[in-house]
Amino acid sequence: MMRLTVLGATGSIGDSTLDVVRRHPDKYSVFALTANAQADKLAVLCREFRPKMAVLGSAAAADALRDQLGTEAAGIEICSGTKALEEAAAHPDCDAVMAAIVGAAGLRPTLAAVRAGKRVLLANKEALVMSGALFMDAVREHGATVLPIDSEHNAIFQCLPQQVPQFGRGVSRIVLTASGGPFRTRAVDSLADVTPDQACAHPNWVMGRKISVDSATMMNKGLEVIEAYWLFGVPVEHLEVLIHPQSVIHSMVGYDDGSVLAQLGNPDMRTPIAYGLAYPERIEAGVPLLDLVTTGALTFEAPDLRRFPCLALAFDALRAGGTAPAALNAANEVAVEAFLQRRIRFTEIAAVVGDTLARTSIVPADSLDTVFAADAQARQQAERYIATACAQLPAA
């Protein structure tokens, strides 16, 4: 019986993870569930899964959970804050950790799981984007197992040589596919008028609002390029992005002999989650087998960097190295939140990120303190740019 901690249990990945878990009560139990503020939803999950720990982002949210559960809280340690998150991730009674907290907030608990030598199901790409070599060094030092949950990286992992799932060994190219999001064919000069609801309406995937906006700008793909660089040791010149509107081929690996291996499946996150939970075995995930006749044509196109400047910015940050990816991620988090609050236009997200990268000091990312200092500096610069250079939009 695998005992699981779910970091970010009330989000989209958390939902999908627990859906797979409830299909296999003989294989998995839940040790800990965490959420930022959704005490109501976490209470429902606590009643169903009876975790040993439940962690929320604030003391007020933890109190709300206690009130919600009442006498049903017996046997559940309810706590709050960053240290409690790290404890839930590293606890000796936990075997595996689903790292599904969105953004920079997920870095410390994910690293805590790595340092405890856990099986880490990595859905929090920002942990690798921000800390890169520090993260991978910790994986090697502490003997952790990291299984990528992003559909693209999960596909790459499945297509690489299984003895050593790394670049080399006859691998010549790694191709990450992208749907192109909801604005792939929209007139570029109309993108300034995009609303948050439009940006969050992904044509293929069900995702949270932040990652949906990242998909619409293709920053999500840019962050995934950086993640692939670190996870698989791929030189940047061997990383390629292709738009594949059907979201059926999740990524591809090209080999020196001309072979290209691809992983296909319906666009449902339960597939990579089930793969990560059961690896190296396979379990039922509730996802129907792909019907290629019904799917029909599979098409591909190169990304238009005029339409998707955030993708180019991510490649720039990867090539710059050091703390540049952390600054990129921080500025993007600030910009996306401002867009969702209707403080800036959709097209200003890239402007915020580009200005921040240009004005933020880039230094070697040789410690977590350095990484978080770069994160803080970039957030401050992004907010300054928004306050002084972005259009002041009328309230919705």
Curated annotation (Swiss-Prot):
Entry keyword annotation includes Transmembrane: no
PANTHER family: 1-DEOXY-D-XYLULOSE 5-PHOSPHATE REDUCTOISOMERASE, 1-DEOXY-D-XYLULOSE 5-PHOSPHATE REDUCTOISOMERASE, CHLOROPLASTIC
Record has NADP as a keyword: yes
SUPFAM superfamilies, A to Z: 1-deoxy-D-xylulose-5-phosphate reductoisomerase, C-terminal domain, Glyceraldehyde-3-phosphate dehydrogenase-like, C-terminal domain, NAD(P)-binding Rossmann-fold domains
A GO MF label: manganese ion binding
Organism annotation: Ralstonia pickettii (strain 12J)
Protein name: 1-deoxy-D-xylulose 5-phosphate reductoisomerase
Known catalytic reactions: 2-C-methyl-D-erythritol 4-phosphate + NADP(+) = 1-deoxy-D-xylulose 5-phosphate + NADPH + H(+)
Binding-site positions, Mn(2+): D150, E152, E224
Gene Ontology BP, a term: isopentenyl diphosphate biosynthetic process, methylerythritol 4-phosphate pathway involved in terpenoid biosynthetic process
Pfam families in alphabetical order: DXP_redisom_C, DXP_reductoisom, DXPR_C
Enzyme Commission number, as recorded: 1.1.1.267
Known role: Catalyzes the NADPH-dependent rearrangement and reduction of 1-deoxy-D-xylulose-5-phosphate (DXP) to 2-C-methyl-D-erythritol 4-phosphate (MEP).
Residue positions binding NADPH: T10, G11, S12, I13, Q38, N124, E126, G208
Alphabetical keyword list: Isoprene biosynthesis, Manganese, Metal-binding, NADP, Oxidoreductase
Cofactor list: Mg(2+); Mn(2+)
Uppermost EC category: oxidoreductase
Lineage: Bacteria, Pseudomonadati, Pseudomonadota, Betaproteobacteria, Burkholderiales
